[in-house]
Amino acid sequence: ITATATSGSGEGGFLGVDIASTNAADILGGKIKKTEAIINIDGDLTADNISVAANAENSFEKDSLTEVGGLVGKVTELGGGLIPFGELVTDNVKIGYAKLASNAEVNIGSGANLTATGNDTLAEANDDGLREGGALNISAISKLSAEVGAEVEGVEGAGQGKAAGSVTPAGGRTKTNSLSKVMPGAGVSVVETDNNASVTVAGKLNSNGDANVSAHALSEVEAEAGVATIDSTAGSQYVNAAVVVAKIDNTSRVVLNGATQVTGELNALAAAKNEVTTTATAETTKDSLVSTAINVTDAVSTADLTVGGNVTAGKMNIAADNTISNEIQAATQVGKSRFQTKSQMSGGTLNAILGTTSNRGKSAKVDKIGQYFSAGAAINIVDEANSAKVTVQKGAQLTATDSGVDDEGNAVATINISANNTIEDSFMSATSVVNNYATKRGTTSSGGTPSTGTGTQTAALASVGFLQADMDNSAQVVIEGSGDQGTGAPVIKGANVNINANSAFEYDRLGSMIDSLQKDYGDIVEKYQEVPGLLTAWTDALAKSGQYLSNPSVDGAMDVAEAFQNAVDSISVKYADTAMGVPEDLQTLMDDLLAFADVSNYTNFYTAASTAGGSVLGTTSGKEQAQVSLAGSININSIKNNAQVIVGKGADIEASVADGGSVTKGKLDISAAAKQHDVALNGKTKYFIPTISNTGGGATAIGGSVGVHDADVNSLVVVGEGASLVGSDVKLAAENDLQHTAITFGGGKAANQGITGMFAYMEGESNSIISVDDEASINAANKLALNANNDTTISNIIFDRTSAGNTAVGASIGVVDYKVNNIAAIVDNDSDAIRDENEEVKELVNLVNNQLSAEEKAQLGTKATVADEANGKGKITANAVEVNAKTSGIITGVSVAGVTAGASQPNNRGTKIPAQIAGAGSASVNEISGNTAALLEGVEVTTASTDGYVKVSASDDSMIGAYSGAAALKKKGRQASSGGFSATLAGAVAYNEVKTDVTAQIK
């Protein structure tokens, strides 16, 4: 039984509709391109093999849409009012828009009874993650693909004839992308998507072979907006903006509420995959008033699986898997010099400027403003929520009948319950560059064409890069507790049982670059062996790449970067311009290599803002300097990464299988693992080596970089009162793996005064917690082990370098404020923390409660009263009991500030040297608190043999260090001797405040 719905459009269409013959406002006013494939079954089906498949696919591909009056105001509304384009409709505005929905749905009603009598087995997963081949297959697959683009390009001699960037819309009318002197150029892309796949089973499923019940939501969204202007007309001024607004929702859901009987293997899966690429790029190469790019991306991806009925199978895999990758960028360029990187650039703060330009009759005023102000800004705002969740509801019973032993006699899991949320790759950036260069004596270029005659100064250069990224990532398995009457708790029984929650933010930024290089290298290795040194240049680099791929790490990435830098250096620029300039594939290879020169490719969160200026011909007149040069980059990240396994009150989980008249106990593993490896970089650098070009081109240069990095990474296993855990070996594990790196670089040069400040603040929590209530019952024929491990590495690195003709002040401040807790405990975790006298238990209860919702706390019985506890304590029976908590890692803060005043500035020649000040200061502060504890309290422990033991241990091997340095240098005139230097100011402070405890206790 199959339902298939497919919809797609290629270039030349707009939501599948000819824009020339359709009212655009109606389309944007609520019409939606949607595909639906729905199957409803509420009767009896019997066959050897049964396949029920709902497949929906919705795709849209569109490079760009020429502006239409009715679209502009509507897109402004959809973009949240960020850009008021309503009065700025010109030939330079393009809009790209797509609103897509796709839904694949299978509903097996309560009156349905599906029976597959065949004994076919499941195959390996295909590219969509679907396992076919079983006797019974029920699946829903929804695919959504959207490509939206809006590109505006101006040309030399704009407005004369057909422009190179012109388009021919449907209907054959040619519209030229001529750039009016004062009208803006704008590219706007808006995309809204809703992708859903779901399978709901309320009836009966029976299979004599294997069975698959799965939902797959696969979403891929790409939105780009770009504007680039080129004009040779002197005095022209532009406002340029690129805007992307993306709202993405991707959901996969499976519900098993009926009775399911499978002789073979049952695969129940909710799978979501979300790929997001959004880019806003604004670039002007000559006269420009302001260049702006804004990227606002909101993405949600969810995989959710619920079991509420009775499920019996030989073996069963019950999983929710969510996989995410994203590349979200904003960058802008103003001025003559070009800042070109592999990742496109974007920028934008337009609102304050458009009030002037919206009145078309004031072109003279706009032209005048353009002589005094050159600005660029990149704003990137990202909000993501990604989750994978499995819930075993009240009343559910899961039973696996397989022996749990493979053909070679090895133990295999017969019940696998897992929630996996994985950020495979993530890159978010905001970069802005503003340039002011003089082309000849008496002329300036304030981000544009020279204005001659008077040598008018550019009053201000302003460049801003702003990134705000909020990410909430979680993986959760919830085994619900009993109802209010103490009945209905879930029962899970199988020979070997694994219950796992894994939430991972992976660092593998170089993987795609290396793959691309190796592919292109292999394609041409035989064709161009005659190019001297070409093939041997990459030997070391490729070897380092192989080492990195086998064991990805931040340090490994740095090794690769250095190796490829050496390779690029060994192939001179001459090769790129000549030998490599002719064969296209060799140029592609060089592009692959140069990708390693882009520092952003090594980071997850990147901001940079810079201004630059001076004279191309080396002239020295102060008239060629901007009066004020401002550059600021702001990098704000808030990341939550949580992995949780919750075993509710009264839940019964038993690793055992009946074999004839006996019962064989197996292995019960319950674990939560949270992994966060990320790098945030703030400031303009190359290979993480600081340059001093963040601010410049002005008599006074002011620059600042601010990084605020908040990461909460938590792994939690909690077992409620009255729960029963049984197996030969019972293992509970919580694992935190945090490598959080923030790097802030900055500085600049100025003719007279230079002031820079770098500030980076890292805060958050890293908690690895196992909490078992003392009213739970655990029976392990061999060993009970609780292992909490927390490896937290925090690096906060700041470097500031400033030089100026007269006054230079630089400051670097770094603060690390983190709580690191690592606790493994069997205690009264449903007690009120106020009543408990044990500080460690109070802290434990608080930590657990802070991570759980009110509903989740209720599943554990955390609201018990004193009278309730008269029901008695739990009991642990095992040959060996181990409760271990181990904390490790390195927390480092490094800040360095250096300044030079009175350095040999060209405009100091022949002038009286004014008073000069050089001051540098740096501060590095670490405030670290937390507990490492292993607790066994208030529970009866019985060892099963005379050689049994109880071991409780806690250790903290972490290292914490703060390092700070400052240097100030003042030099008079152009003297090279030591006599040219005089007193300076410099100061450095390093401070550690550490409040950590280590406790191992049996009570």
Predicted regions and their residues:
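Low-complexity, glycine- and small/polar-enriched segments
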Residues: 1-1003
